């Protein structure tokens, strides 16, 4: 790792105190003369061709945004260091930076690929292609009534239902909005896609788990209602009547660096289930 870059969310570190501390520690630990620093808000416009490892300083939202922005152009691993709120996707919290540096120096880490989604939105007026690491959400506007959704999987009709919307999630996104809507946790290394309805007007419409290479087509009957499509809860577009939405596995995944002692279930307990450090499960 001769060329390390750091992407910082400036809203999380307005005085650069954390950034300067992290840069100093990495330079000392790896005997580096220079570390390139990038603003997470415009990182898509930057040249990261020579970066061997990208450190992301921020929260889950920062990492999600960078994963989407760099998906086409960046092939090196990403190490998330949480300086935000939840930090479920990050490999380490900023309070454990010294421990993380030792593990990096000793080579006690591995790379994991997390699948992403590709979303194509097509109408007579517009065509747009989006990507998501967590989820693609189709949902009605605040004052709209229920919408009728028709879902096809691999060209075969799966379901037609009325409700507030639906969530198409990756395993990484299974702990986010999908979980809040009643979807299951999916182990993040798997390649699966889930479809979870939002407030369906029938109890028979439940989450379905699909193979990772499934192709999902969604049509929404909403001539008089407002419908919005969002990716990772960050980018939203208004869906017009007669618009088709196609969601499938993205060709490229995102490569994350995690440490050898990473315990998914411990992170799940502490940051999602209990939101505490209780029940570490050292002994049963």
From Swiss-Prot:
Protein family per UniProt: Belongs to the NAD kinase family.
Named cofactor requirement(s): a divalent metal cation
Role of this protein: Involved in the regulation of the intracellular balance of NAD and NADP, and is a key enzyme in the biosynthesis of NADP. Catalyzes specifically the phosphorylation on 2'-hydroxyl of the adenosine moiety of NAD to yield NADP.
EC number: 2.7.1.23
Gene that this sequence comes from: nadK
UniProt cross-references to Gene3D superfamilies, sorted A to Z: Probable inorganic polyphosphate/atp-NAD kinase, domain 1, Probable inorganic polyphosphate/atp-NAD kinase, domain 2
Keywords: ATP-binding, Cytoplasm, Kinase, NAD, NADP, Nucleotide-binding, Transferase
Protein name: NAD kinase
């Amino acid at each position: 790792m001769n060329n390390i870059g750091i992407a910082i969310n400036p809203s999380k570190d307005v005085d650069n105190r954390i950034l300067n501390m992290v840069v100093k520690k990495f330079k000392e630990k790896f005997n580096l003369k220079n570390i390139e620093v990038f603003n997470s808000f415009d990182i898509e416009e930057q040249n990261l061709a020579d970066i061997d490892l990208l450190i992301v300083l921020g929260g889950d939202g920062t990492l999600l945004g960078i994963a989407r922005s760099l998906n086409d152009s960046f092939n090196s691993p990403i190490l998330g260091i949480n300086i935000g709120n939840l930090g479920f996707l990050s490999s380490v919290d900023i309070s454990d930076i010294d421990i993380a540096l030792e593990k990096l120096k000793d080579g006690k880490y591995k790379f994991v690929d997390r699948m992403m989604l590709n979303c194509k939105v097509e109408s007579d007026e517009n065509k747009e292609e989006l990507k998501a690491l967590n989820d693609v959400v189709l949902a009605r506007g605040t004052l709209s009534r229920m919408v009728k959704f028709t879902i096809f999987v691999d060209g075969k009709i799966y379901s037609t239902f009325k409700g507030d919307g639906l969530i198409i999630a990756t395993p990484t996104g299974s702990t986010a909005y999908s979980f809040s809507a009643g979807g299951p946790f999916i182990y993040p290394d798997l390649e699966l896609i889930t479809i979870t309805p939002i407030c369906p007007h029938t109890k028979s419409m439940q989450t379905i788990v699909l193979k990772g290479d499934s192709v999902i087509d969604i049509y929404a009957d909403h001539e008089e209602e407002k419908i919005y499509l969002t990716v990772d809860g960050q980018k939203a577009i208004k869906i017009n009547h007669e618009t088709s939405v196609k969601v499938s596995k993205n060709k490229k995944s995102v490569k994350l660096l995690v440490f050898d002692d990473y315990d998914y279930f411990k992170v799940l307990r502490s940051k999602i289930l209990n939101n505490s450090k209780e029940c570490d499960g050292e002994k049963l």
